[in-house]
UniProtKB/Swiss-Prot annotation:
Residues 1-20 are annotated as: Disordered. InterPro entries: Histone-fold, Histone_H2A/H2B/H3, Histone_H3/CENP-A. GO terms for cellular component: nucleosome; nucleus. It comes from Caenorhabditis elegans. It is found in: Nucleus; Chromosome. Acetylation is generally linked to gene activation. This is Histone H3.3-like type 2.
Length: 136
């Protein structure tokens, strides 16, 4: 069966959109005519490495601002109700949070590599936090 070309879409956080049934019939008719061009696919891991290099070069924030702001406000509700935040304060919290997470993922990746794996697992993150002294 011929493959169809996939285009990059921005994630909305919900379920992936379902393909229409009409595409199946269109694909079958295209196979008969033989006009389907083979789709170029990168080898597994190539796109991941490209994304790693891209995000290591960039300096912009990786988490969206509004979802992060909602999370901060939700956590702050547990301590005191009706707290107000300056936008600079939330920006500083986001910078610090992202720097912490990036460092943690770097250490987690080193733990996975030490175990002769390329896939990080929860036990790698637990080991990284334990070595850092964050959790016993």
């Amino acid at each position: 069966m011929a493959r169809t070309k996939q285009t990059a879409r921005k994630s909305t956080g919900g379920k992936a959109p379902r393909k229409a049934l009409a595409t199946k019939a269109a694909r079958k008719s295209a196979i008969v005519t033989g006009s389907v061009k083979k789709v170029h696919r990168f080898r597994p891991g190539t796109v991941a490495l490209r994304e790693i290099r891209r995000y290591q070069k960039s300096t912009e924030l990786l988490l969206r601002k509004l979802p992060f702001q909602r999370l901060v406000r939700e956590i702050a509700q547990d301590f005191k109700t009706d707290l107000r935040f300056q936008s600079a304060a939330i920006g500083a919290l986001q910078e610090a949070s992202e720097a912490y997470l990036v460092g943690l993922f770097e250490d987690t990746n080193l733990c996975a590599i030490h175990a002769k794996r390329v896939t990080i697992m929860p036990k790698d993150m637990q080991l990284a936090r334990r070595i850092r002294g964050e959790r016993s």
